[in-house]
Amino acid sequence: MIPVLLFDDGLTDLGPLSDLRASWEQRTGALSAAERWLLAGRLAGVLCAQGRQAAEAQRLARTVAALAGQHAATPPSQPQGGHAAVPAVNPRPHEAVLVNARFDVRAEDVDALHPGSSVRDPQGVLIAARRSGAELASVVTAVAAGSPLPEHTALRAATPAPPAHTTSWQRPWHLLDAAAFDQRLARDFELLTSCWQPSEHGTVPSWATHAGRGAVHVHATAQVGANVVLDTTGGPIVLDRECTVRHQAVIMGPAYIGPRSWISEHSLVKARSSIGPQCKVGGEVGSVIFQGCSNKVHDGHLGDALVGEWVNLGAGTVNSNLLNTYAEVVMRLRPSAPLERTGRQFMGCVVGDHTKLAIGTRIMTGTSIGTGTMWAASTPASGTVRAFTWATDDGERQYQADKFVATARLVMARRHVTLDAPEEAQLRALLAAAP
């Protein structure tokens, strides 16, 4: 099998979710692009500029370690189990297929590429290219030096038409598109459960209810409480390893509950919800993506929203996902960015990594909350909240760097993750550049 190198074409802007995360790291279904290719045994590595290499290497290693621990018994020789070699940042394999991480490229698409061929979308954006030897090495070197990969001369070649099923995303609201979200979840569920060993496939316990004809995949280590309802009328449900669904919770498919995540008693998890690893979720959520390691464990509504890592939403936090006028939602993803039409009547919020919202926080429709925000004001969060805003009823100021880093280190340690020097440097640089 030809290995895959993932790249970010620089054309995406997920607002605060793009501050610390490349496109291959973003959870777009149950998985990220990097996780998909890792589980398929095809990922040789990722490409990025030299300035981001140390932080990207740290996060990639963390992803590899997490998946290796979850699927350690799966033979790497199988096309959908494990990975034969440890992926790296800016590696130089003899031959590889360069894959644009924001496109939903499948293994069969990669295998169909002939040596030297490329695939572009109707707008000319590079989707994938198969290269080897000196040509491939020159591409990796150029990207490490900061050059945009799609413009590299080695990638200008005849391009066949992209497969009809190929979808892509550029903005947060694209990730919540129902048809594309359903498609990604279905593919991810098939990939994930194919990596489980026979002994890891559990069943819905007798004290819970499975309603609907869709599949429920319960990992043998998942804990399902009394009177839990798993409703697959709208699509399948996956309860991944060591997750916990407490008594009388209702989950409506398609939905994914990630490893070691916790769904509180009486919670309602509505369709098209992807809860990444080590999250705590309660209240009512629907059409949401939690990147991972975030808390919304208490009551409150969160809908049509994307939440980064290391986020805490205090008890009673609620968001609006529909304007009183029922009009199309427009968003400004960053303070300096233009207003953009989302094409959606329902659009809640985008919450950046390391954000903390106090109890009772109200989030208005179409709000973008910047990385590292600490919101403890009684007024609603609305519009665009600048990164590293410290907001109280006395006004807004910037988060103090040392205090922010100390809090981040403490929060990450609660989930046995260390804030290493490269990631700390990335956070401090982002804070220093905040307006």
Model features per residue range: what roles?
Residues 1-213, 387-435:
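Terminal amphipathic alpha-helical/low-complexity segments used for targeting or macromolecular assembly
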Residues 25, 265-266, 272, 278-435:
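Glycine-rich hexapeptide-repeat left-handed beta-helix
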Residues 121, 219, 240, 298, ...:
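Acidic surface patches and DE-rich sequence motifs
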Residues 195-236, 251-252:
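Pre-Walker A segment
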Residues 216, 236-237, 245, 251, ...:
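Extracellular beta-strand scaffolds
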Residues 217-219, 224-225, 238-240, 245, ...:
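All-beta strand scaffolds that present successive hydrophobic residues in beta-strands
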Residues 225-227, 234, 276-278, 284-285:
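Short glycine-rich loop/turn motifs
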Residues 250, 256-262, 268:
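Membrane-embedded translocation segments of transport machinery
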